[in-house]
Amino acid sequence: MKADLERVYTLFPRLKERRNAVAGYLSGGEQQMAAIGRALMAEPRLLMLDEPSLGLAPQIIDQIFETIVALNKEGRMSILLVEQNASLALDVADYGYIMENGRVVLDGPARDIAGNDDVKEFYLGFGESGSRKNYREVKHYKRRKRWLS
């Protein structure tokens, strides 16, 4: 158990600094790190993460996702990541799913999904020319076609 705790402290050095703090007084990012660390202490075969970037500062998001990538490369466990930031999720995933209204409408290798023109336009903010769109230019869910007919 002590080795597991040291592993968590290695992954999240900030937690070691704050180890005597009450969890409720930790920042949002520190709370997310503590939640992931607590899960890792159980040595799971499947780590499920629901919106790990929600409400966090970009610097903390980067740190958490670097840790997710490192955990994935270790190969000790599978990771199921639910994330609304599609670009970030597809960057770290091997395989991806897109859901609409509770149904899987597209799945495949993450790089194939990220390369799909509809996904680029509707979820990643790219226009037909391949350039990033301004928020005002993005189509607000008025699609030419639906995923499911």
Regions picked out by a protein language model, each given a short descriptive name:
Residues 22-26, 30:
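Conserved ABC ATPase signature
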Residues 41-45:
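A short, proline-enriched helix->beta-strand linker immediately N-terminal to the Walker B motif
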Residues 26, 39-40:
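ABC ATPase signature
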Residues 47-51:
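Catalytic Walker B motif of ABC-type/P-loop ATPase nucleotide-binding domains
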Residues 62-76:
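Helical segment within the ABC ATPase nucleotide-binding domain
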Residues 126-149:
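ABC ATPase nucleotide-binding domains
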Residues 95, 107:
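Short, glycine/charged-rich "phosphate-handling" switch motifs in NTP-dependent
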